[in-house]
From Swiss-Prot:
Naturally occurring in which organism (per UniProt): African swine fever virus (isolate Tick/Malawi/Lil 20-1/1983) (ASFV)
Swiss-Prot/TrEMBL keywords: ANK repeat, Early protein, Host cytoplasm, Host nucleus, Host-virus interaction, Inhibition of host NF-kappa-B by virus, Repeat, Ubl conjugation
Name the UniProt record assigns to this protein: IkB-like protein
Family: Belongs to the asfivirus A238L family.
Subunit description: Interacts with host PPIA. Interacts with host PPP3CA/Calcineurin. Interacts with host RELA/p65; interaction of the 32 kDa form with host RELA results in the formation of a stable complex with NF-kappa-B. Interacts with host PPP3R1. Interacts with host EP300; this interaction inhibits the association of host EP300 with host RELA, JUN and NFATC2.
Top-level division of the source organism's lineage: Viruses
Gene: A238L
InterPro entries associated with the record: Ankyrin_rpt, Ankyrin_rpt-contain_sf
Domain remark in the UniProt entry: The C-terminal region contains the docking motifs PxIxITxC and FLCV, which are required and sufficient for binding to host calcineurin.
Pfam families in the record: Ank
Post-translational modification: The protein exists in a 28 kDa and a 32 kDa form, probably due to post-translational modifications which are neither phosphorylation, nor sumoylation.
Length: 239
């Protein structure tokens, strides 16, 4: 039984890798043929537990998605959009970090008809909106907020919120956007003691340096020497 099980896992992995090439090339006709033969192909996965549906989201194939949506009588009938890979990431995590918020909006509009969990975390507690914040995807963050994502939820390892990740990864535009409607001023959320924790535990410095002073917020310039604190000054609201 173990040998048969290993063979089936290997065979499924090879099959999904072959379908991956089909998706990468954008061969919708071949994919339609495969889907008609086995509709559950979209939930098959490779060794990393990445499903065919995740691959469609990763490569941003909107035509493939629209084809799948037309085959279902109701959202989620066939496609399992909450299925996780080996790191606990779902298709929502991959959609959120892509630089294509229109693709995310399309999927949100479709699955949102019956209600969706947009704060679905991976094994580290990172939600899709945090993934979008790490990449600086402002429009994706706003789309997820519109569908009920919680920007104040914290991950399991670092205890970061969406806003904290935007600060830590240096995406000032996203920080400004979040400050306008969803957060308090910068100095009230990212005090100096957090910076000390970064240095001790992770040996990494945030790309946006924030002082404890209410009127001073500093953004580190990436083109400067990292050994010197060369900054440009912003006001306390990040404008």
């Amino acid at each position: 039984m173990d040998t048969i099980g290993l063979f089936s896992v290997e065979a499924e992995h090879l099959f999904v890798e072959w379908v991956k090439k089909c998706i990468k090339k954008g061969d919708l006709t071949l994919f339609e043929t495969l889907f008609n033969a086995d509709p559950w192909i979209v939930n098959r996965c490779n060794k990393n537990k990445i499903t065919v549906f995740m691959l469609i989201c990763i490569y941003g194939r909107l035509d493939f998605l629209r084809f799948l949506f037309k085959q279902e009588s109701y959202p989620g009938e066939i496609v399992n959009h909450y299925r996780r890979d080996k790191d606990g990431n779902s298709a929502w995590h991959y959609l959120a970090e892509k630089n294509n918020h229109l693709l995310l909006e399309e999927v949100l509009d479709y699955f949102g008809k019956n209600g969706i969990r947009v704060c679905f975390p991976n094994f580290n507690g990172v939600t899709p909106i945090m993934k979008a914040a790490m990449r600086g995807r402002t429009l994706s963050v706003l789309s997820l907020l519109k569908y009920g994502a919680n920007p104040n939820r914290k991950d399991y390892l670092k205890g970061f919120t969406t806003w904290d990740w935007a600060v830590f990864t240096g995406h000032a535009d996203l920080v400004k956007t979040l400050n306008k409607g969803y957060q308090k001023p910068l100095f009230m959320h990212f005090p100096l003691y957090k910076l000390d924790v970064f240095h001790r535990r992770f040996k990494k410095k945030p790309k946006i340096i924030i002082t404890g002073c209410e009127d001073n917020v500093y953004e580190k310039l990436p083109e400067q020497n990292s050994n010197f604190l060369c900054v440009k000054k912003l006001n306390k609201y990040g404008k």
